[in-house]
C-alpha cells in the first residue's frame, strides 16, 4: 500500500458537480450562478478582505510592533547546565560542542538556576549578579 494508491471506497464520496451540461442536470445554462452580476462572471468575486467599500478591518486597526532580530542571537544558559560540562574554560565554543547553544547564537548570558558544585572558569560570557556571586563563592572565575 502506498499513499499514491489510496482512494475512497466506491460510492462513499459524491461525484464532482458538473455544471453547464443541460437543464436536466439542474445545473445547466447559468450553472447555478443565477443571472448577471459580478458573482456570475468568470473570475468575478471580491477579494477575501473586501467589505463593500467600507475600510477593511486590517486597515482600520493600527499597526503594532515588530519581531526583534536581537533575540535570535542571544541565549541563556543556567548554572545547572554548566555544572554538567567537564571543560576547564567554558566559552561559546565549549557550549556549542556540548549542544547547549546552536551556531546562530552570538552571545550567552549565564543565569542563576540549578546547583553548581565545583568551581568553573567562564570566558567571554555575560553573567547575572546572582550567578556571579554563586560562581565566585565556589572559587570560580569570570573573564570578560
UniProtKB/Swiss-Prot annotation:
Chain residue ranges for the region called Disordered: 1-45
Molecular-function GO terms, alphabetical: rRNA binding; structural constituent of ribosome
Residue ranges with Gly residues bias: 21-31
Cross-referenced Pfam families: Ribosomal_L27A (PF00828)
GO annotations of cellular component type: cytosolic large ribosomal subunit
Keywords linked to the UniProt accession: Ribonucleoprotein, Ribosomal protein, RNA-binding, rRNA-binding
Any single biological process term in GO: translation
PANTHER family registered for this protein in UniProt: 50S RIBOSOMAL PROTEIN L15 (PTHR12934), LARGE RIBOSOMAL SUBUNIT PROTEIN UL15M (PTHR12934:SF11)
Function: Binds to the 23S rRNA.
Subunit structure of this chain's protein: Part of the 50S ribosomal subunit.
Family named by the database record: Belongs to the universal ribosomal protein uL15 family.
Record's protein name: Large ribosomal subunit protein uL15
Native source organism of the sequence: Legionella pneumophila subsp. pneumophila (strain Philadelphia 1 / ATCC 33152 / DSM 7513)
Amino acid at each position: 500500500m502506498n499513499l499514491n494508491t489510496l482512494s475512497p471506497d466506491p460510492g462513499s464520496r459524491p461525484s464532482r458537480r458538473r455544471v453547464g451540461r443541460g437543464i436536466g442536470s439542474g445545473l445547466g445554462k447559468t450553472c447555478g450562478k443565477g443571472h448577471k452580476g459580478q458573482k456570475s462572471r468568470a473570475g468575478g468575486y471580491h477579494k477575501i478582505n473586501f467589505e463593500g467599500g467600507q475600510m477593511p478591518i486590517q486597515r482600520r486597526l493600527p499597526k503594532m510592533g515588530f519581531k526583534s532580530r536581537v533575540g535570535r542571537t542571544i541565549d541563556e544558559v543556567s548554572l545547572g547546565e554548566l555544572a554538567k560540562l567537564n571543560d576547564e574554560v567554558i566559552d561559546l565554543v565549549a557550549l556549542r560542542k556540548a549542544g547547549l547553544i546552536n551556531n546562530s547564537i552570538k552571545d550567552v548570558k549565564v543565569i542563576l538556576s540549578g546547583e553548581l558544585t565545583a568551581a568553573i572558569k567562564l570566558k567571554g560570557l555575560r553573567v547575572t549578579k546572582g550567578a556571579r556571586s554563586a560562581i565566585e563563592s565556589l572559587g570560580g572565575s569570570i573573564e570578560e
